[in-house]
């Protein structure tokens, strides 16, 4: 009593916060515990924790069950929860033993907190829009009016508890009403109008985040539901849950915040020592020692916004990006303990009996804490969070859009190659003639309609709204698909002179024809996804009037096997009506050298994270592909200039190439172009080979490949022999290694050593007639000096 105003402002903030993130609802359990401890006495915190677990687990289990089935099941679960609550209420009233009475009291509090969560999440956030969708908008208005009426009645009748509850609900609804701005904005049909929530049905789909799909926690127990990457990495559901969902997707992120981070891993010495973690643990201990009740409340906040989120999200492997932001509430809770730990440390020092010592020591400790915690962490993390000079998103979007011809249609894959492009078009007004088509969204009816209706419109053929609304994957077997050729009027015009390269008579231009395999499988039945159907539909309806492109980031799985009909023209692949060369060298060179922006990519002072480094590989790939094409065309000087430009604009010191084969290919291109090193200096190829050989855990097949390059390309037989001898010592019974070592000895005119290897092999496999014949052949070809050397080695061996 006396603090009602704070509860009401909390209710209003909860309503507002729903519009920012649903994570805020989990603070309800923290608030409930704070109120509970103000009202009731608890004899044992540990019994309380057990009772809360029982109460929340029962309520949560019933909630999860209700979400998996029909609405009637939700009603059944609600009734069950009500019966349990009523039973515990009767137990609370009639129990004689203090422990039993307290148990009932604790569980009732957990039920009450869970009920508050469900009322807000299911009753208000989801219930009001569903009511408008299923019954009508008038029903929602009536429900809100009734809510206000009951509130006024409760206030007038001085039913204080009921009035407080009803006012809190009213304020939550008022805060939640800010969502209306989204629907008002959507009704204006802006160019970016995701989910199109201007009808009650679409509003419900938007609020329930239907476009993201759903995953049940039980999915981790069914390996058939796992992505291939996860199925190969984890041996069981428990292994997957602990090592990926708990350790990788929560503990690792927690360690980043309070211990230290290096790339994607944990660095225990980023902050010199993990001071935030140590002080936080100290604060946790102090909090439980001095105020168990509030410590339990903070612990509830910590767990509900941390490990409980892990259970609820049930994230699959891999994720498209790091998800540390999902657990920010948990990190906030631990930060409270850091503050408590720092305050407790200062308090203990200030209470030293020697006042002459305690005062200066308190100031010194405060200064050290200030240095060790916020300042130290700021200094350690500042560079990684400093975005000054980082133009990657802007330039990457600019370069993709500028890769497209006038009025192009561009298929993109995910967020990184879609949202920056939309920003450039809507804010910077760049290349608004290009229509960006996100393949993930292309599976949704609302997005298909927007592509058809919003300028620049896309011709999707004669498809009705009803057909779009009911569109879904279709059964599909591997079969040929035909797309109509460009019309004669287009082929004879100067709009796309590149079509003349195919050499067909405009009147006899053949259709585009290729085999399309199913892109989705359920059991033995194959399907085409909606996005695949729409790609084919757009191709056919467009009739080549507008150039069509795939962004270079689109995976082969989404290209429907059209690679032979695509030509790379920068950061995009253009689709042609007939098979073409994989690279349009002229357009590629023009875009890479004259159009694209690469601001600050060669500035070592600018921080680029791992995601950006992977993204920049698309630039490097474009340069390398162009260099290969120029080498095949016989223009070695231009090829070398292309590689030099790549090294200058996108230096490997800042953006290292992760793929060893491509890293090595650059060296081979330099060598083929005539860059073979100055006298006494290693060539680019030799430098790269040495780097690869010095990497940890190089597998033997790669070493074989490097030995082959030393021998066949560089003619460095001693180096090749050194690598192969080491491999042969490790794997003496490997025929590939022994055979290649013999071959290199032969090419190096060291037949005595070749015979020595064959002797060792025949000692292991005496029935290998091929090896025996080869040994005899080499013996017959030996020079007298080699024969003498071989005989002396044989005598030493026999001794």
Regions found by a protein language model. Name each.
Residues 1-9, 17, 22-327, 333-407, ...:
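ER/secretory pathway lumenal C-terminal domains and tails of membrane proteins involved
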Residues 663, 740-743:
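Surface-exposed aromatic
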Residues 709, 743-744:
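Hydrophobic face of amphipathic alpha-helices that form TPR/SEL1-like repeat modules
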